[in-house]
Amino acid sequence: MKELSLNILDIAQNSLAAGAGHIRIELEETEKTLSITIGDDGWGMDEAFLKTVTDPFSTSRTTRKVGLGLPLFKMAAEQTGGWLHIASRTPEQAPEAHGTLVTTLFHKEHMDFTPLGDMVSTLTLLLQGTPEVDIHFSHTLNGGEVSLDTGQMREVLGPDIPLNSPEVLGWVKESLLEGYRALGYVF
């Protein structure tokens, strides 16, 4: 993939396919590193599948025999000298705390570092397609933070205003852009 935001969108879509009602996306960025954590409360993966999930020929899909999302994300991290770690628990393993946590570390100074890309569009697209899912996003960089919490948005807006309405999506986009501009982030 040409930018990491597309990997993040792919992993979030995996979370949705696993029945997640809550998705947490956290980015911590320094001058030299980018850490990305994506967590959910979906069905999780059993130990056997978890061991093979970064193999491109391991997929839960029935429509095709390959799954490239996690393998490409892992490769993107490792080619910078970083890593990818996945922890997952099924409801049978942990009835009250099931789900999956994907954590990566990228070294930004490496010549093979894939740019983060457009997180604003990624989040807007994710929210547009899944307004009922709680999404908590935070990106810490340059001593500040850009964040989005759809649970808080729902509390403020009430039940009659859908989060994927054009007005709300426009506000989300402008709010995120304003936050990134304030931190000096360049897309």
Tell where the protein language model's regions lie, with residue ranges:
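Flexible, glycine-/charge-rich segments associated with ATP-binding catalytic modules
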Residues: 2, 78-187
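Conserved alpha-helix in the HATPase_c
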Residues: 2-10
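Conserved beta-strand-loop-beta-strand hairpin that lines the nucleotide-binding pocket
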Residues: 6-7, 16-67, 72, 79-111, ...
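Aromatic/hydrophobic pocket-lining residues that form π-stacking "cages" and hydrophobic walls in ligand
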Residues: 11, 73, 123
